[in-house]
Amino acid sequence: MPELSASHRLRIGRHTEQNRIYLLTANTLKREPVFRDYTLGRKVVHQFKQAQDQGFADSLAFVVMPDHFHWLIQLQKGSLGQLMCQTKSLSTRSINAATGRTGSLWQQIFHDHALRREEDLVKLARYVVANPLLANSRAAVFQSGSHPFNTNRIIVCAAAS
């Protein structure tokens, strides 16, 4: 029997549950810093909003860094695989159309972490929001009402300094 790749082994036994909270992380292909351009990072944020508007997930916190994103969600319907496939596919199409790029934007795999205790939520939300500071990046923080993704949550979009 052929040996399974590390990414395939990660997916064995993966089970997603509606209403569970997950921290999702996806990296750009070859860790290319695509989102140094703030307008391109906004296209990813737009897909987060679409997923919420379509009832797939409630966005609790997120950050888009130059070469990856962290997205803290509560899954509402479908699976994590479906959610991430849609988010990555639609953001790739939008970014490729805007830049004239072709091909893949994201690494095929993504990382997910299911929260097991309520206190983990605060810890992970702080990690997401602090990520630009930890990475020594410049961040623009928007409060509810001043941002197109108008929720009662703080939204952090990061750009390289």
Task: Indicate where each model-derived feature is located.
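Short catalytic/metal-binding and nucleic-acid-binding patches
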Residues: 1-161
